[in-house]
Amino acid sequence: MFSWMGRQAGGRERSGGMDAVQTVTGGLRSLYQRKVLPLEEAYRFHEFHSPALEDADFENKPMILLVGQYSTGKTTFIRYLLEQDFPGMRIGPEPTTDSFIAVMYGETEGSTPGNALVVDPKKPFRKLSRFGNAFLNRFMCSQLPNQVLKSISIIDSPGILSGEKQRISRGYDFCQVLQWFAERVDRIILLFDAHKLDISDEFSEAIKAFRGQDDKIRVVLNKADQVDTQQLMRVYGALMWSLGKVINTPEVLRVYIGSFWAQPLQNTDNRRLFEAEAQDLFRDIQSLPQKAAVRKLNDLIKRARLAKVHAYIISYLKKEMPNMFGKENKKRELIYRLPEIYVQLQREYQISAGDFPEVKAMQEQLENYDFTKFHSLKPKLIEAVDNMLTNKISSLMGLISQEEMNMPTQMVQGGAFDGTTEGPFNQGYGEGAKEGADEEEWVVAKDKPVYDELFYTLSPINGKISGVNAKKEMVTSKLPNSVLGKIWKLADCDCDGMLDEEEFALAKHLIKIKLDGYELPNSLPPHLVPPSHRKSLPKAD
């Protein structure tokens, strides 16, 4: 998709992929500069909503924004992923991280202060200069040669405090900065502490700054090993209830539960759950490079739709203003009537209500502008954006889909991502149907004496029991017939419609695997084949 994605783990360029990569990147940039940017500039979009996009915004790596109250483990989470300290890292139970830190790849380890960072054209942070020195003094880029950072960048944010001091003492609009990052990152991770769950008013306001970016949000319930299973259920329920009041979306947010640091678990009752949740989160993060172009395309479409709506609003206000007298009174009236104007424009141009900016914020911003200096509606600019949305985007989608098919599914490597991919600590290694794969003895043999006793109560004839008799025993597991049917096919190795004592023991073993919560294999692994049947089966490839 992007030039930095052109190398796989072995360091060799993918053949035939780079042309499509550059086409997608250049296509997105070209569409924005030729179609969307003129519309934004004509109606002061950048003053009301978001600064203009630059080349670095299209070419940068996928970014992850971490947000949470103080001491929820944001910085520790980054260290857990990288398995390495980074410049500017401070960890402790008190509010430690007081700055926004962009953790990015660099050939040498070091840090760049905010004022120098916003003048670097290769970094996607130039537009942050509008937040002033109060913010730039609390912003830095931490660079280090870490393999994880070759594929993604991570933004660490200051811990959110409670009280009025949180809002006043920073010297910059914290929520506006979060909103700026939210528009540009690929994933927003909200971290909560399971041991002291709380969503303060300040945190609620920060979450509301992510309005319109709901598809990027993931939730991590961290430090879950500090509570037992019963407490964890209560904490999870309280978290979902609290989030439901803050995030106005009908969809349920994905919550990952675990303990994301490289220390022993304090409570091991839910170890298997934590491992599965960590792998799910890793897979989500590893998918970001593959989906980066789609995300940027999606953000460009959302931006274009908002730019159109903004143009309709501004041009309507311009049209309603008198030429001579009563301008201030008319301005106040139009601002007051803005909700009605929204409804009118929705009907006139067949626009969804969800495409309109928030009324209250728009009213506050309009107070500072002279409506007579706004431009009238320019149909050609609107038509150019409509043509882009209708025709140009579809051709890019084809290129993106082709590139995604050629990319590896797990591009993020190194750090914690390598710790569970191979060897005995891979998720599910030696568990379920994989148990006994490394052992010489047949894994079913240890329980076979118990299964043999059952087998001989089922009236075997010539050393085998019929399907009818086997069914009587198998249905006692209360598993669905569809599952038992699959187990029968796997266990009946010679396909004679009957089970000998080894096949019956195998069937009971597979039932146990399913009852323990593991998935059944689609075909019988070689180590599960009964010893007396191994010669008759074809060797696995």
From Swiss-Prot:
Chain positions found as Phosphotyrosine: 451
Annotated region (G4 motif), positions in chain: 222-225
EF-hand domain boundaries: 479-514
GO annotations of cellular component type: adherens junction; early endosome membrane; endoplasmic reticulum; perinuclear region of cytoplasm; plasma membrane; recycling endosome membrane
Entry keywords, A to Z: Acetylation, ATP-binding, Calcium, Cell junction, Cell membrane, Endosome, Membrane, Metal-binding, Nucleotide-binding, Phosphoprotein
Modified residues (N-acetylmethionine): 1
Comment field on protein domains: The EH domain interacts with Asn-Pro-Phe (NPF) motifs of target proteins.
Record-given protein name: EH domain-containing protein 4
Residues annotated for ATP binding in this entry: 68-75, 223, 261
